[in-house]
Amino acid sequence: MYKLVLIRHGESTWNKENRFTGWVDVDLTEQGRNEAYQAGELLKEAGYTFDIAYTSVLKRAIRTLWHVQDKMDLMYLPVVHSWRLNERHYGALSGLNKAETAAKFGDDQVLVWRRSYDTPPPALEATDERAPFNDPRYAKVPREQLPLTECLKDTVARVLPLWNESIAPAVRAGKQVLIAAHGNSLRALIKYLDGISDSDIVGLNIPNGVPLVYELDENLKPIKHYYLGDQDAIAQAQAAVAKQGKAG
């Protein structure tokens, strides 16, 4: 049996302001930093250790990983930073308040943009300053692979090459792997691992800063998964994530 631990970054400044964030590189709030430290404490108390970690190239995930490593005294851990673990790109919605957007376009439309599998939000213009083309962190990524918007289907297609070519081989080699990433890049990976249908994935909400443990068989198929921590508090956090895109 193998174990894989996933963690969504702690609360970010735009999580707190209820904005669509995507690839915009916002930082953690004080609460987000505390959530990351608490995640590290939970993992340490439960006896976990790691051989390698994966994260995105966005600071809210990177800093979450730092805090977890710090709490676990694993600052020396090898870390792979990959744009493939970035949050889903929210296109022209990036920076907009979710509730205000729902009030303008309707709860149903915003739910489709936030949670449907194959309907992306309106795209950015290529000349928009939020477009990734001139960002140095993506200088080595072929331009045609950089998105101006994404649906979850696109995010799955982006995440899976990293899983197949790097993460899965590390797990099979017996390494203890930690992934610190984002709500939708983790939803994409979970959809693949659990074989969740395109329709059912709409209802999957991942709370900030809570370790999610997957136990996998020899074929890397899930045996079971569970969150570490107070289960009632985790359920409340999941419900809060689900309500973010509603007008009232």
Swiss-Prot record:
Record: residues binding substrate: 8-15, 21-22, 60, 87-90, 98, 114-115, 183-184
GO MF, one annotated term: phosphoglycerate mutase activity
Sorted UniProt keywords: Gluconeogenesis, Glycolysis, Isomerase
Keyword rRNA-binding tagged: no
Gene Ontology biological process terms, A to Z: gluconeogenesis; glycolytic process
Metabolic or biological pathway, per its Swiss-Prot or TrEMBL entry: Carbohydrate degradation; glycolysis; pyruvate from D-glyceraldehyde 3-phosphate: step 3/5
Enzyme Commission identifier(s): 5.4.2.11
Record PANTHER family: PHOSPHOGLYCERATE MUTASE (PTHR11931)
UniProt protein name: 2,3-bisphosphoglycerate-dependent phosphoglycerate mutase
Name of the gene this protein is made from: gpmA
